Amino acid sequence: MRHRHGLRKLNRTSEHRLAMLRNMANSLIQSEAIKTTVPKAKELRRVVEPLITLAKEPTLANRRLAFDRTRDRDVVAKLFNDLGPRYKARPGGYTRILKMGFRVGDNAPMAFVELVDRPEPAAQAPAEATE
């Protein structure tokens, strides 16, 4: 019986699923926003949120745990130097999933996953038309 098994398999082997979620988490932490399918986005939330919670307390043990889960030093540095202090006062809910229609090829439901309270990119002034 399949009672209380909450993990989505995403039609992949366990190694493939783990590697895919690790890569997606690294991409989300680096760029702070990615586009993916809705089921992947919902699973990604379960990976990224505990990482940011770890980064809120910058101990050596937490850095080692984060590196063990991400396997990327740049991602760990951004987590502990940038995201941990940013979300220090927030008690969870660091990601936002926005549904954005369906993919053209296979009609898969797509979503935009972003970190909340991320700094907006600086808007460039419109170029003046020279005559």
Curated annotation (Swiss-Prot):
Query: What are the entry keywords?
Result: Ribonucleoprotein, Ribosomal protein
The Gene Ontology terms for molecular function here are: structural constituent of ribosome
List the PROSITE patterns hit by this protein, alphabetically: RIBOSOMAL_L17
Q: One biological process GO term for this chain?
A: translation
Q: Does the keyword DNA-binding apply?
A: no
List the GO terms this entry assigns under cellular component, sorted alphabetically: cytosolic large ribosomal subunit
Q: Which domain of life is it from?
A: Bacteria
How this chain assembles, per its entry, is: Part of the 50S ribosomal subunit. Contacts protein L32.
Tell me the protein family, please. Answer: Belongs to the bacterial ribosomal protein bL17 family.
Full protein name: Large ribosomal subunit protein bL17
- UniProt source species: Methylibium petroleiphilum (strain ATCC BAA-1232 / LMG 22953 / PM1)
